[in-house]
């Protein structure tokens, strides 16, 4: 059984995904900018919405569950959202 990832590890996984997405979008050099990272995240979430629709999944329910996980995880480690 593997240990649960820490919140910094979770954030790093998200960053790695955004880097991969940025490379695909040819905007890797701009990823350091908070504005560009936010745009990439927005684009990625929109793509996930398309994926969810294609699979007949409730995207908003997934977001709600993700928010509950985030709140529980930040509470566990004493992080501030």
Predicted feature descriptions by range:
Residues 36-64:
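An amphipathic alpha-helical micro-motif enriched in hydrophobic residues
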Residues 58, 65-75:
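Amphipathic alpha-helical binding modules
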Residues 20-24, 47, 51, 55, ...:
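Surface-exposed polar/charged interaction patches
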């Amino acid at each position: 059984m593997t240990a649960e990832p820490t919140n910094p590890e979770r954030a790093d996984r998200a960053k790695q995904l955004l880097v991969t997405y940025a490379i695909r979008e040819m905007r890797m050099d701009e990823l350091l900018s908070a504005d560009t990272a936010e745009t990439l995240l927005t684009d990625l979430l929109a793509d996930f919405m398309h994926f969810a629709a294609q699979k007949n999944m409730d995207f908003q329910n997934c977001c709600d569950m993700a928010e509950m996980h985030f709140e529980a995880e930040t509470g566990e480690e004493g992080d501030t959202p």
